[in-house]
A protein has these predicted regions:
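STAS-like cytosolic regulatory interaction modules
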Residues: 1-57, 61, 67-110
């Protein structure tokens, strides 16, 4: 079964928006990792917004990607904000990860 997935990046003076639509899983995560890596490597602007409101599915690969992005941005001095679709939020809820835990994950370096 072929699923549709798209990742796009938009950069303004204030922020970088990395938007994803479709299914975020082991097959599509490398595209998102590349976009995040490019944004961090550019080193400006220092605000990244993950717009994952268009995701229809997210597996544990997406959870790992979000956690590693929180840490990576914190270590690089970036502010990170995110918008999650209901399916993505359900994936986080299923494993007990909530916004406050995500934020503290980046702060304490756990």
């Amino acid at each position: 079964m072929t699923t549709h997935f798209a990742v796009s990046t938009e950069t303004t003076d204030e922020l970088v928006v990395i938007a994803c639509t479709g299914e975020l899983d082991i097959a599509t995560a490398p595209d998102v990792e590349r976009a995040i890596g490019d944004a961090v490597a550019a080193d400006t602007p220092k605000l990244i917004r993950l717009d994952w409101s268009g995701l229809t599915f997210m597996d544990s690969t997406g959870i790992r990607l979000l956690l590693s992005t929180v840490r990576r941005c914190k270590e690089a001095g970036f502010e990170l904000v995110w918008d999650l679709s209901p399916p993505a939020q359900r994936a986080l809820d299923a494993v007990g990860i909530h916004d406050d835990l995500l934020r503290s994950y980046g702060e304490n370096g756990s």
